[in-house]
Amino acid sequence: MKDQIVFKFPDKSFYYEEDFCVGENNYEAYKLIKEWPNWSFKGINIYGPKKSGKSYLTKIFSDKAKSKIFDSKNINKNNLDLILSQNVLIIEDIDFFSDEVFFQTILNDFISKNKFIYLTSNKLSGSISFKLKDLISRLNSLVTVAIT
């Protein structure tokens, strides 16, 4: 054999909306993402167990909103300007946010500018063991959608 044929397969890190499988366990969240930016609210928390499709839905939303996805474990003062420059705040895994004051500061900035907020977590945002009452209040004001 003189020439080897090389097949180029797509990168597995790509999430294509047309490949997303909508079912009763994620229908409500998917429907809300499709309706954005015509929401009657400014913030959402999509929560559910690991491997339930939160990251896939978040990628679909991020593409639609043209905003960057931030992982709560990687958010710090070094990327604050980039975070605040987004049209929509998209943070995954807020359960693991270690600096509550910093998190609240970011949320307050987006709320004061009437920008959209999209958060994911493993459990309902209001039931995460945060200590700051104002942060808990902000999180409790979000629309929440469970996926399984």
Question: Where would I find each of the regions flagged by the language model?
Answer:
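Post-Walker A helix-loop "phosphate-sensing" segment adjacent to the P-loop in P-loop NTPases
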Residues: 62-73
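Conserved AAA+ ATPase "SRH/arginine-finger" region at the nucleotide-binding site
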Residues: 142-148
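Conserved RecA-like P-loop NTPase ATPase core
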Residues: 20, 29, 46, 110, ...
